[in-house]
């Protein structure tokens, strides 16, 4: 079971148009309806703000949006501390507050995170420069993270 972040959903929407890849979107809707695919309310808000037609499609598909609980907010703060971020001084090349909430949501629900943020093969010299996949790979965070294409390949689904 997976949680999508905004980058992956917008990537899918922009690169696999519904009219040209209807089988893919029927399958994604089925995954949503089976509750195998969800989104943090934070990521959903980002999708709706940036790509309203995709947001509308997700609502129509019945997407379950996972709320940010006190436990999730506290875990996001813990991760923020691991990154050495003080106050609102997030590094422009690293994760932001919403990203931490999305990671903490996936962690709280024991879900794999699907993110299309850039992979960093070598962790940056400054932890606050880490992107979502790199933060997820930290031992103290330990959230499995894959990108959209890996998600599709691993599913074994065939779209005709």
Where on the chain are the PLM-derived regions?
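Acidic, PIN/NYN-like endoribonuclease modules and their adjacent C-terminal/linker elements
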Residues: 1, 13, 21, 119-160
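Residue-level detector of structured alpha->beta connecting loops
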Residues: 36, 62, 107-110, 140
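Domain-start "cap" segments at the beginnings of catalytic or binding domains
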Residues: 37-40, 45-86, 148-150, 158-159
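Active-site neighborhoods of divalent-metal-dependent phosphate/nucleic-acid chemistry enzymes
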Residues: 70-134
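A generic structural signal for well-ordered alpha-helical segments
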Residues: 32, 58, 105-106, 136
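Short His-Asn-centered micro-motif
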Residues: 4-6, 40-41, 95, 115-117
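Short, well-structured N-terminal submotif of metal-dependent ribonuclease cores
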Residues: 1-39, 45-60
């Amino acid at each position: 079971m997976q949680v999508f972040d905004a980058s992956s959903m917008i990537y899918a929407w922009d690169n696999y148009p519904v009219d040209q890849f209807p089988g893919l979107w029927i399958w994604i809707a089925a995954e949503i309806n089976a509750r195998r695919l969800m989104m943090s309310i934070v990521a959903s808000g980002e999708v709706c703000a940036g790509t309203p037609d995709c947001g509308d499609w997700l609502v129509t598909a019945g997407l379950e949006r996972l709320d940010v609980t006190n436990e999730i907010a506290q875990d996001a703060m813990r991760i923020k501390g691991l990154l050495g971020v003080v106050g609102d001084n997030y590094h422009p090349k690293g994760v932001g507050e919403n990203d931490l909430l999305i990671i903490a949501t996936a962690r709280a629900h024991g879900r794999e995170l699907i993110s299309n943020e850039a992979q960093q093969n070598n962790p940056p010299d400054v932890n606050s420069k880490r992107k979502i996949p790199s933060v997820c790979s930290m031992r103290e965070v330990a959230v499995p993270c894959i990108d959209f294409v890996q998600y599709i390949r691993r599913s074994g689904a065939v779209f005709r």
